[in-house]
Amino acid sequence: MSLHNILVTGGAGYIGSHLVDALVGGGYEVTVLDNLEPQVHRSGTWPSYANPKATYVRGDVRDRAAFEPLVLAADGVVHFAAAVSVGQSMYQVDRYVDVNTRGTALLLDILVNSKHNVQKVLVASSIGVYGEGAYRCATHGLVAPTIRAEEQLAAKDWEQRCPVCHEHVESIPTPEDKALYRDNIYSMTKYHQEEMVLLIGKTYGIPAVAPRFFNVYGPRQSLSNPYAGVAAIWLSRLLNQREPVVFEDGGQLRDFVSIHDVVDCLVLMLEKPGADYLPVNVGSGEVVTILDIAKMLSRLLGSSIEPKVTLTGRKFDIRHNTADITVARERLGFAPKVSLEQGFSELIEWARTTPDAAVDFFDKAMQELQDKGLLVKS
């Protein structure tokens, strides 16, 4: 397999644009298809960081007339275009299914019904397909509890319990073969995307990989999108002299991975066959509480602002999920290099030197959750 022309959908976005830089630097010809979604690109124009050596097409992955010619001109497709937010997906159901599921279906329909040269497809999946992460019960071994009941959250009983004996369980790194449980519309669409791509890939002999991203952070992350990842939301709050809001007690365990390590893994997926036809966790392998991340951001900023721990929950939130990256390590030779301290220092420096990077719309997003009844009342 020899790739030369790569199409990156959503390539003006955060992860996509960093991958475009790496591919251009590696000698690939790169075309970007992006609709410049206003929620992400507030100016409605191509971002200043867009690599000048790539070709840019403004268009939508649901528009066959725009999408098909670009697919047919490529020998590799990286499909990142998507609507991204767990909470928002619960009240913009049609939009999320239309953009994520239908957009992916159109890509696959083109591949199945047109003469093309595509030799590799990557589709962005998510930690969200797991629902809760993996757990071990002291009595019953590996267990897979589902989303916590509203009554449990209202009682501030944050930790997961064994579905058999109902005792508290221990969080362990989540492998790709863990049972999947979709507890929100966004996660359902990511599951559909990866399942469709891997199925069509296997059926028609088109090597395909579904990277399951854990909590990715780094420069170019949309700090003004209140539906983005928690680190970006907290940094935006801090830069606007407001406290980061941490749900529950802040003890939720996550895996935060630098955008640079993510891009390294994606390039390995494109260039090596070791993960073909598989979903693959993309994380750092490090475990940290979200409260520790909020405190780290404040400290690295030199701020005296303390996180606000709400001791309230959201109906769709999981408790713990961290990455077992054995598959990426063993099949691709993936080795994360960026520490949390290094990575968040870089993110902060970028945010400080980028005009209007952090406009705080968090309160608006919170009000929407409140209005839709998605916050748990204690």
Give a label for each model feature:
Residues 42-45, 132-137, 221-225, 293-294, ...:
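Short aromatic-enriched loop/helix-cap "lid" or pocket-rim segments at secondary-structure transitions
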Residues 89, 162-184, 208, 212-223, ...:
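A conserved pocket-lining segment of Rossmann-fold NAD(P)-dependent short-chain dehydrogenase/reductase
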Residues 69-73, 110, 237, 265, ...:
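CheY-like receiver
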Residues 25, 59, 239-378:
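C-terminal substrate-binding subdomain of Rossmann-fold SDR/epimerase-dehydratase oxidoreductases
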